[in-house]
């Protein structure tokens, strides 16, 4: 891989067929594929069999969509009814939500300039995420004896409530701290600490609302709400060894898994809206009988 490549993968489908995929962080205007003599030299003669080309937004290849003469579509932004179930996977009900926008341009890809990363490292595609793809990120501390965190700046409307959420899963570390950081938020810095192994909160500040939902396979949806005090603010996330201890000796490999960062205007959390380079808006749901 080179340039803006994020990940490459191949799956053996049997009978000599392979499904090959390449993920890039770039504006794509053309896709080229050609026979090759080796890893660096293309051939001018010879042939290969190709089938079922697909270009999509995302960090991993998803199930093939037959597009014929129109674009194939799937996923949470498609105009299809959504059923919400209880924690036991029972008692389904139609999910109807107002229009919401995820204000973060990259909800699943964290290795961008949107995030400042002193003493931490993001590693893309290191675990299976809540959506079933191998597209969760390892969020680990480096080997420094220091504070380990990542932050992103956001543009807000002063006086409005905003809700930030992140999907987290324990790895070598169990704890994560989410901090609505600085004077851009009412009450200045407000933080929550969450144990992704037990599903319980540790040290938390007052003056904010927060909660979590189990997502299965060790994943938890963790969210926190506060009012904006300014038009700009900061969100910080810390991988932690223990509750509320942000400065420690890292080992360069240990951390937690994260997925699906979302910031939305509103006093409560809504369902996940994936973004791949720009803010995305989910239209309001409606139902008539």
Predicted regions and their residues:
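Glycine- and acidic residue-enriched flexible segments with recurrent GG/GxG motifs
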Residues: 1-289
